[in-house]
Amino acid sequence: STLMRSSAASDVYKRQKKYNTNCTFHVNPFDAYMDSPMWDMYVKKDLLCRNADGSLVKGDVWWNRQSYFVNMVNEWNAGVTKQRIDAFIEQVPLVKETGVLYFDNETQYPPSLYHYVTKEDQISAIKKAAEYLKTEYGIQLIGEYADTNLYGVCSLGVTWDWWASLNINQMEVAPYIACGGRDGTHDELYGGQIDLTKRRFQVFGASVQLEDTQFQRDPFKVARELSHHTYVYFYLNRLLRLKYETRDTLGITLTLSDNVVSKWDNDNVHRLYRDGYLMKEGHDVFVPVFWVNHLEIMAYSVKGRTGIWHFPREWTGIEKVDIYTFNEDFTGLRLLEQGRKINKNQIYLSQEPDRAQIIVPAGTDMTDRSTIYSNPPSGTATFICKDVETHGNWKRKYGKKGYDIFGHSSKLPKTCMLSYIGDSLKVLDNNSTRPVSLQKVEGKGRIEAVRTSVLHQLIDVTVEENTKVSLYFADYKEKNCQEVVDVIDVNTKRMLASYLLNNFEEGVYLSFGVSGNVQFRITRFFYDHYGNPDYPVCSAIFFDKE
């Protein structure tokens, strides 16, 4: 159901470009209402949840209308789910441009006792709908709540209360699989009290809830929330999480890649540092806007601030900057100062309360709306095959152009560059005799070693055109390792290929056709209701002609 006409939705999508943004569309496939034109069909085909006595299962009353629950299993089996998806995409084709569809209130799938349909059956039907969206239209399902049963099926990158509903340790879930924002109950800027039990929201990055009546009449609040929460949330959740520590009563320290540290100090203030320089203190921020195709800083202070901010290392050598703010109706920028000199990669700023300042190198064309996603790709990658037959006996099949057998020997092609980010090397057995263990380069010995991390790690590879790159994975300790292997374009951050791995106690090779510079991202992943697998592992990388 939806309260927006298709014509209105299309108008919103057309206007989004004016504001340099993309809109997502929210639908609720779980609720049914008697005033819907589809009501009679759903009753006739028996597509609604029923109690054991045959009566309809009621939901809440929304906008003075009684809701009822859709039997997702019967709907799918009747072919109606696909029909609804097809009709919706035809009605609002611009959803394909955004690439995501948001299921509202994704917790409402009760059992239908009359039909002997369990809640687990309902969840399976949702997974089928998600798979259909992905395979048929290339659209990723996203959702309002984090449900462990849908982990990995429904992407949760914008889930506003993901920590509360998933109730897990953030160090166990990568931000590109699940992260999110907050509600208004723990932030004094919403008029509420800070809930110290939720301070991790800001340490890990919390976005903004733009629902209901919070901001509808005051766009300045939107600018405020985006500046000191969403920009930081976006910045933090593109980094690798390396270490999480607590201390004393309030202290939290999160160490991330790129020499970034996010801290909640004992003075009850959140601070963010990169290379030891302050980027955020409370509600004052000086953070990079990294998705645009030029250097840019967003500076903002809720109550006003005067002092020195240090530019990121990428700004070294820049001598002058231009400073902008938003115009009155937030449709563009207004120049505040042109050609301000800076010294020693730092700037003295006098920040007015509640006014964003956008700082760029002098002469930057601010009408250029290109982003990093419009950059030329750094490389290409396609999945070739999965090999579960070779085990550790790689010599006759892999590594003709080069290899790196972790903890043992490395011989790289002359044109290859290889580096590892966010992991550590562990040699488990240097004298193994098991077939799953990798053969040593010389002799008959075998080795069991892995590069591993608590959550995720990167292998950065640059190769010449048409190179076959194969990674070897083995769950040597048989600890239920489950991981997802993504291949990422370094320039645009787009995903080029992806593969889910589990049950690889006997060893498995994943081979990809690669050209240029790509990153293999290996992430701890969960199947079967958050089954607590062991840490991600990788044991070798091989190079051959494609």
Residue ranges and their predicted role:
Residues 2-9, 13:
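Single conserved hydrophobic/aromatic residue that forms the stacking wall/gate
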Residues 375-546:
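Compositionally biased, intrinsically disordered or flexible polar/acidic segments
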Residues 21, 26-32, 38, 105-110, ...:
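An acidic- and aromatic-residue-enriched active-site/binding cleft used to recognize and process polar
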Residues 73-99, 105-374:
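Active-site-proximal substrate-binding groove within the catalytic cores of carbohydrate-active enzymes
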Residues 1, 34-38, 432:
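Short acidic-hydrophobic catalytic motif
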Residues 29-91:
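Active-site-adjacent "subsite" loops/lids of carbohydrate-active enzymes
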Residues 16, 23, 140-141:
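Hydrophobic beta-strand scaffold residues
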Residues 14-20, 93:
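Acidic (Asp/Glu)-rich catalytic clusters
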